[in-house]
């Protein structure tokens, strides 16, 4: 990005998270015009979809929605696109429920994976796996509190969420237990430990920190009243019944004192390698 122009570039590889693990596609489209009538583009990295809907489809719908309308600043384009996502039909209640279930499943797996790692490094391992689950819960809760809540979830009562979603949480928990039983001996869980594991998973979802299946978005270009280009970058895990799981937007702008900038997203080591050549 310089005073005269901004360029976006991406490879064609994209990944999505599935119940059996991540899958990589090597023919994904990652660059889109956000408007047909204004110099504003969108780049997507990592997962090319939000709530299971491909970004390519969402952007096409947004272009139809915005038509010939133009904005004075790039930030207004970002806000307009975010509002469209929030109100658009593809992000309805069913989609939000499914996405929340996927995020909680990830959080539950983090508890069990951490317990496995703790036992692996224990010089005098216990035969009771629940000992390690308890330690994993305590550690993850501390991590979540240290990171703090994402903005959308700051005022959400995790205890209330657990009560509202007990049936879903129990079902997902059993799925995770069965997955880990294939390689590990998982004893019956005391009621309090079971609840604490599920509460820890909720806190993982609500706290700041990158999850595996995130979608990275970069919106770049000019507003009608802007002389220099800028870009806004953020990462999202999609919509849930409690709000959008999304990082704070990070904006970079060219100015009289900042004449050039190079931004790298996802695999930053590729950019570093390019600069060293």
Can you say where each PLM-predicted feature lies in the sequence?
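N-terminal nucleophile
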Residues: 1-277
């Amino acid at each position: 990005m310089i005073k005269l122009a901004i360029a976006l570039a991406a490879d064609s590889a994209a990944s999505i998270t599935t119940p059996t693990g991540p899958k990589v596609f090597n023919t994904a489209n990652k660059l889109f015009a956000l408007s047909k009538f204004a110099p504003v583009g969108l780049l997507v990295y990592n997962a090319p979809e939000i709530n299971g809907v491909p970004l390519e489809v969402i952007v096409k719908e947004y272009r139809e929605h915005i038509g010939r309308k133009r904005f004075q600043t790039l930030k207004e384009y970002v806000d307009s696109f975010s509002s469209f996502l929030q109100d658009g039909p593809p992000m309805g209640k069913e989609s939000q429920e499914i996405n929340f279930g996927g995020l909680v499943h990830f959080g539950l797996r983090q508890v069990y994976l951490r317990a496995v790692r703790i036992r692996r490094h224990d010089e005098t391992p216990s035969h009771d796996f629940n000992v390690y689950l308890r330690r994993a819960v305590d550690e993850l809760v501390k991590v979540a509190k240290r990171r703090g809540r994402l903005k959308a979830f700051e005022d959400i009562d995790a205890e209330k969420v657990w009560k509202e979603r007990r049936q879903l949480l129990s079902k997902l928990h059993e799925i995770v237990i069965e997955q880990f039983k294939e390689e590990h001996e998982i004893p019956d869980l005391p009621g309090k430990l079971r609840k604490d594991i599920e509460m820890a998973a909720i806190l993982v979802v609500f706290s700041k920190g990158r999850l595996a299946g995130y979608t990275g978005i970069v919106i770049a270009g000019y507003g009608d009243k802007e002389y220099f280009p800028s870009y806004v970058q953020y990462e999202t895990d999609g919509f849930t019944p409690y709000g959008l799981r999304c990082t704070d937007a990070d904006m970079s702008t060219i100015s009289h004192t900042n004449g050039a900038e190079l931004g790298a997203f996802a695999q930053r080591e590729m950019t570093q390698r390019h600069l060293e050549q």
